[in-house]
Amino acid sequence: ICYAIHVKLLWEYGLKTDIVFSRPNYCKIDLMVENDRGGQLFMQGDEVEHLRQILKQHGIESGLKELIGIAEQTGEKFGQRVSATCDAKYLEVGISCKSDNVDVFLERFKAEGITAEDCSFWGDEFVEIEHELYGSDSFMYTEKSKAGDFFDVSAIEGNRPEAVKVLGGGVETFLTFLKEQA
């Protein structure tokens, strides 16, 4: 499915992409192959606008929502419902998403007496990247997980789901949290 998305974007839109990794149930497609983050793991502040310009140049006028629609329609052609999210540089496509994963973990934790209230959910992709389209980490907020605590280690400006607390500091903030739990 990811290869088909990659080919469709190239042939029909002239948009060069690269599949940066692929797992049995998930892949990540680099939408801005010319844009090197220079070792930065997190979405950079100017990437969303830069991607919007790239998409428009290639005839994807409605932006990221249209791109996600292309991914979902491609999955349907293979008889597979896929979930697609984006952090600007990468289109993430899978047969499940972070919502599914969080809910499965919480079900398993329940047997150990661990509830969502005992959990915290950390990420760097909560920010709204288009109107009412949030980054992939926002999918961790589900009906089952909403009683937990949500933290964003990205310092990028923008709206986030109401439950998310912005801490910034990148990976170091998360590592400090883990060390303090020991």
Predicted regions and their residues:
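Generic structural signal of hydrophobic/aromatic residues within well-ordered alpha-helices
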Residues: H6, L51, L55, L67, ...
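Conserved acidic, metal-coordinating active-site core of Asp-based
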Residues: K16-S120, V127-H131
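Mg2+-dependent phosphoryl-transfer enzymes with acidic/Ser/Thr/Gly-rich catalytic loops
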Residues: I95, S99-A182
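Active-site phosphate-binding/coordination module
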Residues: I1-N25
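Short, conserved catalytic or adaptor-binding loops enriched in Gly and charged residues
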Residues: K8, E72-K77, T142-K144
